[in-house]
Amino acid sequence: MALILSILLTVSPYLARVYEYMPAPGQFVNALPVATAGDTPQTMAAKAEAAIAYNAGKTVCLGAWGGYIVFGFDHPVVNSGDEYDFRIKGNATYASYSQDATRKGGASEPGIVLVSYDANGNGLPDDAWYELAGSEYSSPQTIRHYAVTYTRPNGLQDVPWTDNRGGNGVVPRNEFHQQDYFPLWAPDELTFTGSRLAPNAVDEGENGEHSFILYCYDYGYADNHPNKTDGCKFCIRWAVDQNGLPKDLPAIHFVKVYTAVQQVCGWIGETSTEITGAEDLHPDMPFPDDPSETGLSPMPYANSQPPTAKILRDGQFLILRGEKAYTLTGQTLW
């Protein structure tokens, strides 16, 4: 026990680990972060982690619709109940010019956000996922159970795709980015499933000139509003299950983000969610005393003081209190 206590560290508010990174094809894929022919899913997850963990501030591109990243913190992010719980940083901006003064627009490339609680206590993102119901969740224009398959082209060509609704198209190449747009470490066919939001881009150019404004959705999506606004903040209480019913989670351990729109904006190219970091907005908040309403076991320190420390051991989150150690689901370890 003395050895374990000697290595305890203060938790970081920032994203600490990337578990999976699989972008859809796009003009920044294989560049943000850089991929080589020898890379694997594991090495690319590590590269993505190096780019955005602990507030590193670099950029990870998710590519066209469906491309995703799964990340976590070095501690559970607690559901505050009535406040924003975490933020996801991207590179969205507001334009100083737009024809629609009733809403914000500029460079908004929204990504759908899902969260997961480590119910089995193994430190891996293999439990149920719950979507955070953003402003477009109930929109009749949102397509559920959508699927797209991208196929690797021969050589440096546009990347073709087909969907499960009879649609098809390409992720087009452009003169600005000359690398391969299809993930080098991926199989020759990539299929993604999820929900697709309505296109948010409007061409407001005049006299034959193109000028695309990508309008922001109200709330609940990554890379949708600039980082200094509340629009990049999220509440765990927005979580819903696969039937759209609210899911009361005491905390979350993992976050998944995927590009939510399938559109191409002329010379700008495909719309692609970018991630530059994530932050717990209340990292010192104690775990709730009684999460029993979620179906999870009450914590062993219910109705007492919060634990003295939280650590990660062999991929598993532990809670230490006195000389006892527990998993986050209440299993006594010693």
Model features per residue range: what roles?
Residues 295-334:
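C-terminal outer-membrane/trafficking sorting elements
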Residues 116-122:
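Short loop/turn segments immediately following beta-strands, especially the blade-tip
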Residues 10-111, 128, 133-292:
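A domain-level signal for the mature, folded cores of soluble proteins
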Residues 112-114, 324:
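Beta-strand signatures of extracellular beta-sandwich domains
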Residues 2-5, 78, 118, 260:
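Residue-level marker of positions within ordered structural domains that often coincide
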Residues 120, 136, 332:
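Residue-level detector of flexible, active-site-proximal loop/helix-junction positions
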Residues 2, 6-11, 286-304:
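Low-complexity, Pro/Thr/Ser/Gly/Ala-rich linker/spacer regions in secreted
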